[in-house]
């Protein structure tokens, strides 16, 4: 696990984009993408660049259960607003949050991931150490699954909604086992509220109580953090 400290999120996005360009030069064709505030500067760099992504496939980590793609809080909407509208891909995959059978949808999405090995996976990290929506206690062997979101995650995400009651209580998420199959993982974290999770991920025991700790076992992980998020690493 390589740690890169940056001044701010803007610099972090630039470095992540440089890593992506290197990966594309080596033949990467499938990107694993994340939502939330952490990767926004990275997507801004992609949008500003002259690069064409129309031969690439993207697979997103997760989607809320119960939100249509037109909801401005759906991750499908987020990706279109922040990346896909400006930079079309050959194919974009996200779980269907309105599937009538969410367990069947999880299995369908898992098959999509199996058919498109991820070359470059972007991750954020939750305050409780979750990656994707893999909450503490999730098995490291888990593949795509339906998640009951923890109160801490609902509270953290409520800032994007009118009220905390509007935050969905479930999501469909790529599992930890699937994430670990990615060729390369770039994790972005900014802000003091991520410091505990980053410390546990880097130094803590590998435990399902802190899902991101499993990344210690991956051969090619780069962690991009600002000084606040890295404040407990010294």
From Swiss-Prot:
Give the pathway listed in the UniProt entry for this protein: Amino-sugar metabolism; N-acetylneuraminate degradation; D-fructose 6-phosphate from N-acetylneuraminate: step 5/5
This protein's record includes keyword Protein transport: no
Entry keyword set: Carbohydrate metabolism, Hydrolase
Record keywords: tRNA-binding included?
Answer: no
Cellular component terms, GO, for this chain's entry? cytoplasm
Q: What is its EC number?
A: 3.5.99.6
Superkingdom: Bacteria
Known catalysed reaction(s)?
Answer: alpha-D-glucosamine 6-phosphate + H2O = beta-D-fructose 6-phosphate + NH4(+)
Q: Which residues cross the membrane?
A: none
Entry GO MF terms: glucosamine-6-phosphate deaminase activity; identical protein binding
Against SUPFAM superfamilies, the record matches this protein to: NagB/RpiA/CoA transferase-like (SSF100950)
Q: What are the recorded Gene Ontology BP terms? A: carbohydrate metabolic process; glucosamine catabolic process; N-acetylglucosamine catabolic process; N-acetylneuraminate catabolic process
Its function? Catalyzes the reversible isomerization-deamination of glucosamine 6-phosphate (GlcN6P) to form fructose 6-phosphate (Fru6P) and ammonium ion.
NCBIfam families hit by this protein: nagB
Similarity comment: family membership = Belongs to the glucosamine/galactosamine-6-phosphate isomerase family. NagB subfamily.
Designated name of the protein: Glucosamine-6-phosphate deaminase
**Which organism is this entry from?**
Streptococcus pyogenes serotype M1
The gene that this protein is the product of is nagB
